[in-house]
């Protein structure tokens, strides 16, 4: 009898051990599956971009893809849009203000009274730069 009791008592922990091992294997398989899914996310994203988002999910219906479903709100958002005319080139530029100085016209070289020798010198310098 003692041998039978020992044998019966030894079976219970073995069964529990086997069940635990099976559960651990199932959990490990699930973890491996999830790891594989995570490792391929980047590749799947690149594939979807390459396909141009052409794949359709089961939740996408044909009615949502029909052009008649898209509503045109342009007349509500910007009613009777008209372009404003650009200013003419003949008008004076805006007034320039710098601390205490004011000017109503754009500056030009004529106002600086540039002498002819200075202009010739500038042309000579520009010509020598071109040769380099």
UniProtKB/Swiss-Prot annotation:
Low complexity bias: start-end ranges: 16-31
Annotated region described as Disordered, given as residue ranges: 1-41, 108-132
Localization per record: Cytoplasm; Nucleus
Keywords, ordered alphabetically: Cytoplasm, Nucleus, Phosphoprotein
A single Gene Ontology CC term: nucleus
One Gene Ontology biological process: protein localization
Basic and acidic residues bias locations: 108-123
InterPro entries on file: RNR_inhibitor
Processing after translation: Phosphorylated by DUN1 in response to DNA damage which leads to its degradation.
Single GO MF annotation: ribonucleoside-diphosphate reductase inhibitor activity
Similarity field: Belongs to the DIF1/spd1 family.
Record text on subunit structure and interactions: Interacts with RNR2 and RNR4.
Function: Mediates the nuclear localization of RNR2 and RNR4, 2 subunits of the ribonucleotide reductase.
Protein name, UniProt field: Damage-regulated import facilitator 1
Species whose genome carries this gene: Saccharomyces cerevisiae (strain JAY291) (Baker's yeast)
């Amino acid at each position: 009898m003692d041998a039978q009791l020992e044998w019966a008592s030894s079976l219970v922990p073995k069964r529990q051990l086997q069940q635990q091992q099976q559960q651990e294997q199932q959990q490990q398989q699930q973890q491996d599956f999830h790891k594989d899914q995570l490792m391929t996310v980047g590749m799947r994203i690149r594939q979807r971009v390459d396909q141009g988002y052409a794949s359709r999910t089961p939740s996408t219906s044909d009615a949502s893809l029909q052009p008649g479903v898209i509503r045109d709100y342009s007349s509500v958002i910007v009613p009777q849009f008209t372009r404003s005319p650009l200013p003419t080139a003949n008008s004076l530029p805006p007034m320039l203000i710098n601390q205490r100085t004011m000017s109503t016209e754009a500056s030009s070289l004529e106002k600086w009274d540039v002498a002819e020798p200075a202009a010739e010198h500038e042309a000579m310098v520009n010509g020598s730069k071109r040769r380099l």
